[in-house]
C-alpha cells in the first residue's frame, strides 16, 4: 500500500483495488475483509472493483456495508458473462463465490450446447446489469477471460456503443 501513495505523489494516477462481496477466501471474516478494503481506500485507492458474483443482492448488501464502514469510493461490480458453466463453477469454488441454484438450473443439460450456453450467460449478465443500473450503479467491470465478444454483444444490446 505504501508504494501506491508514492505513485500518486509522482503523477495523476487512478488506483483501483480489489473488493469481495462474498469475502476473500483467505479473509478471517467478512468484517476483517471489509476493514482491509477500508485500509486500501484510506491509503489512496480511487475505486474498488469487485470479484465477480452472480447474486446481485450480495453486491448490494456489500455496497451498503462499505458505506456504513466509511468507504466512500465507487464500488464497481465485476460481471462474468458465463459461456462455460463448468469453468465458472470451478472459478467460483476457488474464489468463495456462490452460484445460485436458479443459475445452475439454467445451465443444466447444456454441456454439449455451446451456443445456447452463451445466450443463457449473456442473458444473465444483461439482467444483472439492468438490476444494478436501477440500483444506481453506473460503471461495470466485465471479466472477459480473453473472450471479449460476449461482453461486446452484452454492451451493444444494453445500448453502450463505441463513440457514445
Predicted feature locations:
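Conserved, mostly hydrophobic/aromatic
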Residues: 40, 44, 77, 140
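Active-site glycine-rich loop that binds ribose-phosphate moieties when present
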Residues: 26-45
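Short, small-residue-biased leader/transition segments that mark boundaries at the very start
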Residues: 1-7
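C-terminal helical cap(s) of enzyme catalytic domains, especially alpha/beta-barrels
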Residues: 148-164
